[in-house]
Each structure stands twice: as C-alpha cells, then as structure tokens.
Amino acid sequence: MQLPSFLDVYRGLISTSSISSSDPSWDQGNQAVIEKLSDWFSALGFDVDVTEVEPGKYNLLAQKGQGEGGLLLAGHSDTVPFDQGRWSFDPHQLTEKDNKFYGLGTADMKGFFAFIYEAAKRMDWKGQNKPLYVLATCDEETTMLGARHFSAHTPFKPDYCIIGEPTSLVPVRGHKGHVANVVRVTGKSGHSSDPSLGVNAIEIMHEVLFALMQLRDTLIKQYHNPGFAIPSPTLNLGHIHGGDSANRICGCCELHYDVRPLPGISLDGLDNLLRGALKEVEAKWPGRIEIVPLHEPIPGYECQHDHPFIHGIEDLCGTPSQTVNYCTEAPFLQQLCPTLVLGPGSIDQAHQPDEFLAFDFIDPTIDVLSKAMRKYCF
C-alpha cells in the first residue's frame, strides 16, 4: 500500500472539521479526524488506541516501539470556530498561496500531526530502544478535557513530552495559567424614585470591583517571576452588565474577570485569595454575591529551567527557550514527564481569519522532530 504524502495528510486534517466550542451550535466532536489519524499511523506500523472520553470526544494514542520511557509528541485535534464571512478562503480546505498553507488548524494545530507523520515515515527504525508516542487530544480549545483525562488515566510514563503548539519553532518552557470566573450580584429591583424600596446590585458590584482591584495590587506585590515578559499575575475585568432601565433600581449585575497566575501559584491558594478578597463584601451583603467558574481552571506551568531536556531541545533548535503568557495542555502533561511546547507556525495566526502556516516551517520542523525521535527513542 502506498503511504499518503505529507501534503495528503495535511489536506486531510484541514478538510475534516473538528470544531470544539462551548456553544452547542458550533461544537462538532472530533471522531472523524481521529479516525483519519488512526488509519495513517496504523499504516506506519504504530499500535493505535482510541478512547472515547465523552460522547463524540476522543483521544488517540499511537505507539511505535516498546520499553520504558521514550518520547511523547502531543497536540490537540480540535479547532476553534471560524468567523463566517471574514475568511478569504474556505477554512476547511487547504489553500496554497504566497508560500503559505491557509486553513483552519494549519497553525493551531492539527497540521502538526502531518509533520509528526512525515518525520516518522522517513525514520529508519532499526535500533530503536525506547517508544515513540503520538497523542491527539480532544477539546483543548474549551475545557482541556482530553489532556486532563489522559494525564489522569494513562499507564505510560514517557521520559519527555513535546506539545506542537505554534511557537515559531522556539522552545517554550513555561506559561501562565488561566482562571476565569463570574461574579453575580443579586439585588432587589424597585422604582428609582425611592431607593429604600430595593437593593441596588450595581452599588454592591462597585464594592466588589474595589475589592478585586485591591487584590490585583496584592498579586503584583506578592508574586514576581523575572522569566516572564509580564512578571506578575494579571487580573482583568473583562465584561460587566447590570440593570435594564435608568428608572429602575438594578436587581442584578454580573461581572466576568480572569486571572493569569504564574507557575507555582496553586489553584486552591488562588481561589482562597479571590474569596478572601470578597469576604467583607459578602459579609455585608449575605446571600447576594455568587462566584461561578466560567471553565475549569488551568494552572501555570514551568519545566525546570536547568533541566537537561530543555538544553537538549535548545541544541536541536539552535535557539534558547522562552516563556509565554497564553495557555496550553502542558500543565497536565507535565504531571507525567518534563514537557516543552514547540511547534511550527506563529501564535499570532491562531484564532484569526485566514489562519496560515508559512512553507518556511516545513523542512525545519520535520528536521527537528526527526532529530528528537532519534535522540530520545534510540
């Protein structure tokens, strides 16, 4: 049987929609793309296991070789939705133009599996003494369901892991976490001519905002990591809505905010800080303030700066590692083994109309992956 080419695999990945979204009208599941990956890696001699994590949501683990340790190459099989009407090309067809691949998932990050496939296809596996694993997860763009499930249930313990998010082939050794909450204030509506008739939720929210701003200052003073461009945790007030009319006492007000904690700040500790900041306001207004997570929190992540794995990958790439402010599945896979984020394409193209990956990344990415396989599986 003739094996598909790099371009065949790339086209197949992009043409197989696998959008995940908290909006049910967009959410599709990833079964079709997982089935294609299963066929392709099985044809290369990998042992493939597919796990249904939730209905319609699948993880794939492909294994080449036996033994302890080895290398895990990981990525997510889902994409974000796309902005209808704002793309110059069909987002679900791979378009080659101006020395770039255009399409949804070209950079973030289904296309990475085509690079793994091509590197594995070219590899001479004689002398392999440690396994190579390929992990394709579900729902990274929403809940990180696939990575959470894999790290909690896999019996395998690779020596090292590379996640192929778009980093322009610069190794990433750490990133901040992400916590997003809703604060809901329930007041009591009434006619604005007599404030005593109600409880104004906006006025209570004003006290909540003051407490959160004090917490933001505390986080900046107490936590600092010079390895990050923004060296302290950030707290952002992202969305607020309250009331419905100028002549009514506001009965409900809702705030969405997020915090991006540094590595080393525990999620439980951060939650205690957040709730402690609002303790006085809640005591003043019992039963009127509710805090609800927008999604499962994601911890910060950092691979130990002087770890030999970092130095090894820096040598392969010819560039020093760095830290970033966006999130990946690394905090969960790091629970299994030292983990770095390294992949083709730029994060600047992620989640954008006309997402693309430049042809300039093709040969260097295959080369780096081939060298990593050779270094950690032979």
Curated annotation (Swiss-Prot):
Pathway connected to this protein: Amino-acid biosynthesis; L-arginine biosynthesis; L-ornithine from N(2)-acetyl-L-ornithine (linear): step 1/1
Pfam families documented for this protein: M20_dimer, Peptidase_M20
Binding site for Zn(2+) 1: 76, 108, 165
One MF term in the entry's GO annotations: zinc ion binding
Binding-site positions, Zn(2+) 2: 108, 141, 351
InterPro entries, sorted: AcOrn-deacetyl, ArgE/DapE_CS, Bact_exopeptidase_dim_dom, Peptidase_M20, Peptidase_M20_dimer, Peptidase_M20A
E.C. number: 3.5.1.16
Record-level GO cellular component terms: cytoplasm
Subcellular location: Cytoplasm
Cofactor, how bound (note): Binds 2 Zn(2+) or Co(2+) ions per subunit.
Principal subcellular localization: cytoplasm
Catalytic reactions on record: N(2)-acetyl-L-ornithine + H2O = L-ornithine + acetate
Cofactors that this protein relies on: Zn(2+); Co(2+); glutathione
Stated role: Catalyzes the hydrolysis of the amide bond of N(2)-acetylated L-amino acids. Cleaves the acetyl group from N-acetyl-L-ornithine to form L-ornithine, an intermediate in L-arginine biosynthesis pathway, and a branchpoint in the synthesis of polyamines.
PANTHER family to which the protein is assigned, alphabetical: ACETYLORNITHINE DEACETYLASE
Oligomeric form and interacting partners: Homodimer.
Protein name as it appears in the record: Acetylornithine deacetylase
Organism name: Vibrio vulnificus (strain YJ016)
Lineage, highest ranks first: Bacteria, Pseudomonadati, Pseudomonadota, Gammaproteobacteria, Vibrionales
